[in-house]
Amino acid sequence: MNSAIEEQLATNLYYDRNFDCETAKILPGEYYFTAKPMLIVTVLGSCVAACIRDRVSGIGGMNHFMLPDGGGDPGNPLSASMRYGAYAMEVLINQLLKAGARRENLEAKVFGGGNVLRGFTTMNVGERNAQFVRDFLRAENIRVVAEDLNDVHPRKVYFFPRTGRVLVKKLKQLNNYTLVKREQDYASRLKSNVVAGEVDLF
């Protein structure tokens, strides 16, 4: 029997001298949230990241995920692929609400969905991820105040939840293959595992 895939709270914390603050680095399948004045950073290829924050309290977080490349109808909200995407978003939103964020104050900035991984589906996996995150946030009535989606370049995203500031650096030359390998490994794990449990928003 396959083990379940669960979104993991990022554990890679360090001090960033350039920005003079504590920083959390998140990898595919991870998320992080905080009420502190700190930085959350990730590098995206085909994956997407939603930076969600309470614009009043400054409680915010970021996730990093992609939809599994499963068979069936990828647009069907009941498909395993769509259920995993909803799960990845709900884990972050629930953690923000538990930390004291108010649903009516949530706003989002979304990034990624680049055309970086090839050969997963007939539809570009990055486009699928980007469309999913837009549709999910619209359905949840969470306003998207900024986005940088699709394109062919990976991105490095710096998110300061306390202020809502985001810096995006497009990586025109990605000379190492770490990012692509990391996303391919993540996609393989998603495809060979089932989603853990159901998550309900409260």
Swiss-Prot record:
Q: Which SUPFAM superfamilies match?
A: CNF1/YfiH-like putative cysteine hydrolases
The record's Gene Ontology biological-process terms are:
chemotaxis
Question: Which GO MF term does the entry hold, naming one?
Answer: protein-glutamine glutaminase activity
Q: Which reaction does it catalyse?
A: L-glutaminyl-[protein] + H2O = L-glutamyl-[protein] + NH4(+)
Alphabetically ordered keywords of this record:
Chemotaxis, Hydrolase
Q: Does the keyword Hydrolase apply?
A: yes
The answer to whether keyword Magnesium applies is: no
First-level EC class: hydrolase
Q: Which CDD domains match?
A: CheD
Q: What protein family does this chain belong to?
A: Belongs to the CheD family.
This molecule's function is given as: Probably deamidates glutamine residues to glutamate on methyl-accepting chemotaxis receptors (MCPs), playing an important role in chemotaxis.
Q: Would you tell me the protein name for this molecule?
A: Probable chemoreceptor glutamine deamidase CheD
Protein source organism: Thiobacillus denitrificans (strain ATCC 25259 / T1)
Its gene? cheD
